[in-house]
Amino acid sequence: MDPQEKNKYWEIFRGLNPENGYLSGSKAAGVLRSSKLSSDKLEKIWDLADIDDDGMFDFDEFAIAMKITFDLINGVYKTVPDRVPEALVSTSKKHLVAARDALRGNDDIALLHKVPSLDTDPEDAVLKDGFDWYISPSDKIRYSDIYSLHCNKHGEVSFNGLAPVFTPFGVPNSQIQKAWKLVNPQGTETIQKDQCLVFLHILTQRSNGFRIPNDVPYSLKASFKRGNIDYNLDSYNSTNNYYSSPTMAPSTGGAKPKSDLDAPRDVRDSDWELISLRNELSKLDEKILSLQRETDDVNIAQNKSKLIQRDLQKVLDYKLGILQSLKNDGPNGPSASAIDNDLKMLEQQLNVLGRHLEGRKSQVAKLEERLRSLS
């Protein structure tokens, strides 16, 4: 789920006035019903999204339901998937999904979602407390150089993309994964620059003998959410004091993104209708393109017919000239009957071609009329 989609779902969720971070079943069901999907599909979507089976939606569950609903409307899915796509499951919900799949008999999926314990460091006995989150200017330059070498064209880096730099740190693999999860709370495949710098700093601190904390400062964690969207209802307008320290500034601004949905009413009336209209427009564009191709084919055939008619007319004119010469020269020239037969044959061909050309013109006119009616 891309950040723009998630921001859109957040605006819808927030506009429905959740209580203590949860939407009641009636409010959530009202939004889903406005999609005009069949009742059996909506029931399956609800069963998938209500991960903790409490009859309510928190934001993560609401986003899952909305994403699957939109994908069904847009034709990404023909039917409701049997299980929640793994990419939509937040890190905090993976264990619940795994447990639910196990209870339903999907043990292979449960194993897929099983996350090993990363809290216990195999070298914990020799490690010390006092982990320092401060990144000095020199360290920031060093981390930035590493980031620049391994980021893609979008400015993002993946876990595997950074693998070549892990060995020099001498940090156990379980703790490398723990550091990755700390800077990547959303569990995405890639992270951005600020996350990468903090990730490298955590590995540096661990290689210097400091125990990796089990959490990051709240203000820093908030900056890790792509687009700097704060999904905490109680701190929607909170400020970030972390960047007032001499560490580093966020790469993107902190202005609250604007949504194209201003209120729940728009979800029911405008958003689903917009999707439906876009689908109809797409089908109409395809139909127009098909008709245009047919028109082009007819025009090509018509142009060929005109060329043939022109050539036959030249032959006819030539034969008429010969006939006239024959009449002028008397019986010494070619057989008059033979030339007369040639002329009759040419006239027949011209008549057939003329009728064919008129048919093509009529066909083009009909196609053009259909195109105008679709425009």
UniProtKB/Swiss-Prot annotation:
Keywords: Actin-binding, Cell membrane, Coiled coil, Cytoplasm, Cytoskeleton, Endocytosis, Endosome, Membrane, Repeat. The lineage of its organism: Eukaryota, Fungi, Dikarya, Ascomycota, Taphrinomycotina. This is Actin cytoskeleton-regulatory complex protein end3. Belongs to the END3 family. Residues 244-264 are annotated as: Disordered. SMART domains: EH. Its main location: membrane. It comes from Schizosaccharomyces pombe (strain 972 / ATCC 24843) (Fission yeast). Component of the PAN1 actin cytoskeleton-regulatory complex. Residues 37-72, 171-206 form the EF-hand domain. It is found in: Cell membrane; Endosome membrane; Cytoplasm, Cytoskeleton, Actin patch. One of its GO terms (biological process) is endocytosis.
